[in-house]
Amino acid sequence: MMRRLIATISLSAVALVGIVASEGYTDRAVIPVPGDVPTIGFGTTEGVKMGETTTPPKALARALQDVGRYEGAVRQCVKVPLHQHEYDAYVSLAYNIGSRAFCGSTLVRKLNAEDYPGACLEILRWD
């Protein structure tokens, strides 16, 4: 199958399930590691305040909003066609490291130079 322009791709349902499953769920704001920012639900950080609580349906709705923002970042930064699985992986990475880190990464530079294998290997640097 050929790569497609990313404007024609959206995050797959499988990738969304993978993101929320790997993030895990917390019903109250926590600081997952020392020095990190407050996180709630399925990894949401934007606008989260300590003491905040949520429910699974609200957390999933918030995760969908977050995914939309990270998809926007991937679409803005990546200028080359992708396979669905590549797009899913890069949106998932952006969800984990943030839009700024993703867009400023060596991974994106390699990807935009059509160094697909090199970009893929860069994911491992964020593990």
List each language-model region with its residue ranges.
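Cell-wall polysaccharide-cleaving catalytic domain and substrate-binding groove, primarily
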Residues: M1-D127
